Amino acid sequence: MKTIDLFCGAGGLGEGFRQAGFSALYANDHETPALATYKENHPDAVCSTDSIETVDPKKIREDLGVAPGQVDVVMGGPPCQGFSTYGQRRDDDARNQLYVPYFGFVEEFRPKAFLIENVVGLLSMSGGAVLADMVARAEALGYAADVVTLDACEYGVPQHRRRVFIFGAADGQRIDPPQPSHVNGKRSGVVLNDQPSLFFDGPSIQPALTVRDAISDLPDEVLVPRDTQKPMEYPEPPKTEYQRLMRGNSTELTHHSAKRMLGIRRLRLAMLHPGDYGTKIEERLADGGLNDELIDLMMGGAGMRDAAECRTQDREKEAALREVLKGGHTTPAKVMEFLDSQGFANKYRRLRWDAPSHTVVAHMARDCSDFVHPGIDRFVSVREAARFQSFPDTYRFPGSQFRQFRQIGNAVPPLLGRAMAETIKVAIS
């Protein structure tokens, strides 16, 4: 079964459809690094960075050698920054109109079904007018359009991630939304032999997967950012069915690199308990204080960032804190003068082992402060973020760590994409 994958990014939605038995004929994205990732993992697709606003869908269809109606699904997620509730939203953002050329592809290819994925901010964009226009355009082309909001954690993804899907089949045929395979909830990790397989035989509804289910088999130690492409060995066999699913036939671990930090940030992380936000730092510091082990870790622990790489003001602040600690001035009030400078401590958040991750975002490329590992005083690695998104370990992300985090944060979780692909496949087969 064939797809056209527009605004494809790194290929999360495409990977989900591939797992369901589809293959992409053509993929388009304006970001060259993201398309390079797509091409590496979907080598048979014709890939293009040409502007979707200027390409000719008819020429593309003819170049691909397909007639109208021969493609099964035209799918895509128009850039969501203009719709997003994460950060400032602008109703006049030009990116909000990119769904118009998307429907030009639907009109030209006349697929058996179409699918649009986007953030929940789309629902209220311009008072709902953008969504209404999307539905009207689909129905004008003969498609019965439905709109659903799904949380990825209900479809086998160890992450809370609510997204809107607009979809429909040709000739007015209805497509049922996918039924949840997992239920929102909290639990401890389950050993491999006791947990039924995802998408296979077993209870129809399973507990939501957790951070522990996702990453407890990965090494505590991580690579520095520049070594993000270097492979590592798995330290132990998979502990859960999800981990086995993610590993597949992979024999080595890739992209297990994390951001480094100065001692000030390391101390902030050390104060946080699982589930804590940065607002808890002062309370935790007052309760437990600073012991010699924490001070030694801050002064030269593994994973520390070289102060010479940092801004002048950061180097000066780091040096001042070290002098305070050397002098034995470790009262909570004195240390908090450094840890809560300009309110920065409030943005930190440590994950919980026994709950799904919160939403992975592209901003992790710049700052992972709200993705602190639940058991280690470091930020999550690229591969751990990919696990939260349900990218299999065989999925490769070429390029820098910055680009990897950005692409992963922007992606559709493959298992959520697979759930949509399976229900579309049933409807159009």
Swiss-Prot record:
Single GO biological process annotation from the record: negative regulation of gene expression via chromosomal CpG island methylation
S-adenosyl-L-methionine found in the keyword field: yes
Record keywords, A-Z: DNA-binding, Methyltransferase, Restriction system, S-adenosyl-L-methionine, Transferase
The keyword Cell cycle is annotated on this UniProt entry: no
Catalytic activity: a 2'-deoxycytidine in DNA + S-adenosyl-L-methionine = a 5-methyl-2'-deoxycytidine in DNA + S-adenosyl-L-homocysteine + H(+)
SAM-dependent MTase C5-type domain sequence ranges: 1-429
Enzyme Commission code: 2.1.1.37
PROSITE patterns, sorted: C5_MTASE_1, C5_MTASE_2, SAM_MT_C5
Signal peptide: none
InterPro entries: C5-Methyltransferase (IPR050390), C5_DNA_meth_AS (IPR018117), C5_MeTfrase (IPR001525), C5_meth_CS (IPR031303), SAM-dependent_MTases_sf (IPR029063)
GO molecular function annotation: DNA (cytosine-5-)-methyltransferase activity; DNA binding
Annotated PANTHER family: CYTOSINE-SPECIFIC METHYLTRANSFERASE, DNA (CYTOSINE-5)-METHYLTRANSFERASE 1
Family from the record: Belongs to the class I-like SAM-binding methyltransferase superfamily. C5-methyltransferase family.
NCBIfam families (UniProt xref): dcm
Protein name in the entry: Type II methyltransferase M.AgeI
Gene transcribed to yield this protein: ageIM
